[in-house]
Amino acid sequence: MASTNSQDMVCGSVTFRDVAVDFSQEEWACLDATQKVLYRNIMLETYSNLVAVVGSCISKPDLIVLLEQEKEPWMAVNEETGRPSPDLEADYDAENISPQNRIYNRKFSKQSIKQLSRTFDPKGSWFSNGPNYSTFHGLRDCQSDAGQQITNKEGVPPHTCQTLAHNTEKPYECKECGKCFGCRSTLTQHQSVHTGEKPYECKECGKAFRLPQQLTRHQKCHSGEKPFSHNEGRQAFQHPNLLKYPKAIHTGAKAFACRECGKSFNRVSSLVEHGLIHADVKPYECNECGKAFKRHRSFVRHQKIHSGERPFQCKDCGKGFIVLAHLTRHQSSHSEEKPFECEECGKKFRTARHLVKHQRIHSGEKPFECNVCGSAFRLQLYLSEHQKTHMEEKYLECNVCGKAFRLQVYLSEHLKTHTEENPFKCKLCGSAFPNKYQLNKHLTVHTDGKPYQCKECGKCFRQRSKLTEHESIHTGKKPFQCEECGKFFRLNTLLIHHQKSHSGERPFECKECGKAFLLPSQLNSHKIVHTSKRPFECKVCGKSFKRESNLIQHGAVHAGVKSYECSECGKGFIHRSSLFHHRKIHSDEKPFKCQECGKAFVVLAYLIQHQSIHTGEKPFECELCGSAFRCRSQLNKHLRIHTDVKLFQCVED
């Protein structure tokens, strides 16, 4: 729940009027059905976000009441004067008031236009980056220095409300997603989103774009054209939308400060959105899994995970994505184009973002600092991993059975087992479950548990995502590249694990010997070394092992199966690692060199074993007779003397 301080942060200084936009009846009539629904959703979300931060110290505006009742918002008028509520500063022409239907000839003042622009500004509003922003973007075209006039539909000039007055009929429907459009050309442009087609190519650098206006805007980067100038700072900009942001530099307009952390903002809407971070309020909860979100757009994006909807598909590998931006980022992995080159070392990158991260290696810049201990890191990823070392585990305990959980979501799901609240029933066997996620998980029992089969090798999986990961083994594609060393990986999780090796951070330490590890799984695997237990015994020779994986590897020795064959000489090997080491013999690659005598080895383990000759160290001792040996293989051969084990029998007597 939000603290009192976080509520006081904006209470008394921020009102709903600061971030709202109103429409009169004639303005409302100019919007089509889609824009009306969009406006209603935006205003309701704006109010809910404001309440989440401020709390109960603001009253519900009449506009919100009308929108919740799905009534027309222009009905919120002052009955005494017959004029709209004075929420936006506007000048009215009294002679043009129609007493019959209260339609006004409304002339927007500069202040009202600024209010409209500020609320729907691309950088100032928390809903501006969502999928609906481009639909509403046409409202900003009505801005003017002198003001613009919007009259009723009978007396409006053809050009005045051109961006607002759209035909309510939308006969052209997209077959992919069902979205409708008023013009065929608009539909054609939209369809390129699904096809991924980019017919407009830049002759300078070869970069392709979906729309001609995107190409035109991009070409200004090469020409250096900046037609929109700012007088006060004598700065020039390539796009008119960028013109208004530097004005805040000269006016000192960062008037809205957060009382929690002191961060300042140019707009109230940005402050309200930032306040949600301190408030820790997540009003949007998923009915499927119980996960909660602070923002509506994050909630909508999350729901596509459960529905399986991935409308944006890659033409090269067939992989689907929920968001277009993810597809665009993924497509760069297929192209070998790397236009961004480091001036220091000449290394090239696909995106400017990756180049900036790489340049921090040369500059030594570490902008991400830990608030607890002051340690600095080059990447946000390294800081996030480091901060986990300071976090204490906080468990939420069930009052009924005492079971503990890390997250409130998991505890809430668990409590349903005690209340017997299981609304989701299986139609095949009648079993009931507290949520749809567990029901879907149960349904795999009826489909032999693994409904997703690989067409290449026939292997089955319980989840589609696991099948997709597995299929990358057959394709051989490794789209995820490490920025530090250039190594490629099949999966993003493998890349993340690998990147930790560059940071040098090993937060998981063994309490027995002090050895540190990158991952908790590596620490758990290491702990077996300190135990004397060897629970996994070979039924053929009686040899015991600490790990089951070692027993499986050992079993291949008795089976005599050598499934890994060298393509150079035809020699077979039981283990893949043995084949990998053997291949270095053909390549004459011996990277591990002894500093004492200069002898080189294919494998690091061979070098370590060789170095014991110079040191005279014999760490492997026989427990029965006390004999010591340089390597474990010599000890194993010696132990057969005491056990009298004779593994190899002559077939011909």
Curated annotation (Swiss-Prot):
InterPro entries (alphabetical): KRAB, KRAB_dom_sf, Znf_C2H2_sf, Znf_C2H2_type
CDD domains to which the protein is assigned, alphabetical: KRAB_A-box
SMART domains assigned to the protein according to its UniProt record, in alphabetical order: KRAB, ZnF_C2H2
Key words of the record: DNA-binding, Metal-binding, Nucleus, Repeat, Zinc, Zinc-finger
One of the protein's GO biological processes: regulation of DNA-templated transcription
ZnF (C2H2-type) intervals: 172-194, 200-222, 256-278, 284-306, 312-334, 340-362, 368-390, 396-418, 424-446, 452-474, 480-502, 508-530, 536-558, 564-586, 592-614, 620-642
Subcellular location: Nucleus
Molecular function terms from GO: DNA binding; zinc ion binding
PROSITE patterns: KRAB, ZINC_FINGER_C2H2_1, ZINC_FINGER_C2H2_2
Origin superkingdom: Eukaryota
Main location (coarse class): nucleus
Signal peptide: none
Protein family according to the UniProt entry: Belongs to the krueppel C2H2-type zinc-finger protein family.
Annotated protein name in UniProt: Zinc finger protein 59
Organism per entry: Mus musculus (Mouse)
Gene label: Zfp59
